[in-house]
Amino acid sequence: MNPIVINRLQRKLGYTFQHHELLQQALTHRSASSKHNERLEFLGDSILSYVIANALYHRFPRVDEGDMSRMRATLVRGNTLAEIAREFELGECLRLGPGELKSGGFRRESILADTVEALIGGVFLDSDIQTVEQLILNWYQTRLDEISPGDKQKDPKTRLQEYLQGRHLPLPSYLVVQVRGEAHDQEFTIHCQVSGLSEPVVGTGSSRRKAEQAAAEQALKMLELE
């Protein structure tokens, strides 16, 4: 891997790996090698959830479990992680197989989000829980400062449904129009039909649920509710 690109990435992350094979594995999609990042992603997902939950618990001592859960979901969802990945310019560092490269996998939100979680898992194994916790808090500082409890933290499908119900309009319909990839690494494309919008809204994700949420979020933006 290009050492200039990797050094720039580590500066953006705010962390330098002692064991570079962990960084290489974290950046490797399963389409590129049998030594890929899915186990690190599994580990990083759990660590991220703990760190964000702990931060919210101490920042909002009077907020109930439901609002804290919704805030955590907002902070750890795929499109938030993909935003962070783009801030790190992570796409140009990914190791992808030829098929994923050809189809633009370095731009795909699900791959970017999964890689951020894999990096978290890699940093943990390379250091300790205190180091990775502080690193995550650094990455999330602005988002943690800006987030607040309330209806805004409900998931997009719920907010879209409540908006339409409040205006006595039909509920949105979601239709799977395409499923790409093998069973272990699929991408779903959903069309969401919403009253008041002339064309179906498109959402993609690594599961049907995630694709529906992405479509609902896009619909909310088009309705100028975001």
UniProtKB/Swiss-Prot annotation:
Residue runs in coiled coils: none
First and last residue of the signal peptide: none
Cofactor(s) needed for function: Mg(2+)
Domain RNase III per the UniProt entry, residue ranges: 6-128
DRBM domain span: 155-225
Catalysed reactions listed for this entry: Endonucleolytic cleavage to 5'-phosphomonoester
UniProt function note: Digests double-stranded RNA. Involved in the processing of primary rRNA transcript to yield the immediate precursors to the large and small rRNAs (23S and 16S). Processes some mRNAs, and tRNAs when they are encoded in the rRNA operon. Processes pre-crRNA and tracrRNA of type II CRISPR loci if present in the organism.
The protein's name in its UniProt record: Ribonuclease 3
